[in-house]
């Protein structure tokens, strides 16, 4: 039996279902971190034999066992209950990676019937899931299905205008289509699907939780509309299901979407958690969100800031005052806003070629992260001191976001000539990270040129242009409202030199850049990376825009 509740300051529990771990962060009323607990999938649940929390198979398929998440939650709650006074927790919220949970039509479990004397994983056995190993965000096996959907909807621009996103490798709609075509037995026995964040919230709350609109907008099946009038696209569902009847079945799997903006409580914790661990019955269950959006929210950025998250996929996120979908970026309704306020949105640029290329370059040229960091620091920008003999490298191990979705390979250039390897091997770490940052620099400016950020855009200013998450104290003072902080001149028209090479922006103009870049993730801990990011606008002046596209 759990210990009786003790008096003391209120605590708040945040759960994160990451690719490699299930983590719990405990904070107090002042948002001071009290402690962290984690279950590492590879080491503490080694019976599943995952590597980095996932299985890899030929064909760029990356999956993870859903049953492992359930067992990890049992272990994590045991850790938390041993080390903290459970009765002091007032609220639980969380986030999760991008993945789907496929429930069988029979038996769909009754959460209120769970026996508090038994762990969750003994009652939610693997046979309740129609798909035991579900694709994760790194999975690209469904890319051809995403392209088929895109073609059906009239191409990338028409698809983005209709459902808010164009085709990409981990599109949820494409995963559904692939399962129907490749695994009809899984399709036939499915009765419900949930995104991972809603799945985790359901386990904590003891009742079915639907996805929020921010996640629905990323599926490729949702039509966003003002005033909370969004809806599932019947035409897309019919295409995925193969018929109108199966389309209606998919609609029933998806369930209702929370269009309130996420600024409300889902409910309270389940009777199971109250009886087994000693949570108070009135412990609030807050909205659970996708991990990338929770990262953005956790740093409390101002509207003029951008958040750069390094990880298995690198992400650059910022806010937007209105909904203007294009193929150039992903856009989501803000997951935590008051329904009475003007709607806000979050834009995301992503790169699939992130941690893996960095780790490969480390292994090939330095053998350690400290040496990797050192070489980035000591090698001059562009890999050489001279102005005319700069080096470029592009590590595209997976098809990346538009316009590089069709390109794969490792490409190096010296003095404008493609080479197999640099003469100075030490330039590789620096040139890799530069190309990753330059990719975001170019795509940011293309995004700004669409007008999504309004008539004005942020100005990169001062020495505080880049801040790591650990050093971020507060948003820019006085930055309020949908466009506060995005000061400076209107977005400039691209000069003739830029337009002749097909650019819609001036690559030498830094005034459209964000006021600050708040960085998080493992790579953000490298001083060299922070220093390189501070050169965000300076290194752009040596970018021969379009050089990669012209040479590939």
Language model segments and positions:
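N-terminal glycine/serine-rich phosphate-binding loop of ATP-dependent small-molecule kinases
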Residues: 1-123, 275, 279, 283-284, ...
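Gly/Ser/Thr-rich active-site cleft segment
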Residues: 17-19, 27, 138, 150-290
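Short beta-strand-loop/turn "lid" adjacent to the catalytic site in phosphate-handling enzymes
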Residues: 60, 81-135, 163-170, 201, ...
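Phosphate/pyrophosphate-binding loops at sites that engage ATP/ADP/AMP, CoA/4′-phosphopantetheine
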Residues: 73-90, 183-187, 236-250, 443-458, ...
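Glycine-rich phosphate-binding/hydrolytic loop that grips phosphoryl groups
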Residues: 147, 291-298, 349-355, 359-362, ...
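A short helix-loop
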Residues: 162, 180-183, 206, 237-238, ...
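ATP-dependent carbohydrate kinase catalytic cores
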Residues: 218-339, 470-498, 527
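Activation-segment/catalytic-loop signature of the eukaryotic protein kinase fold
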Residues: 388-537
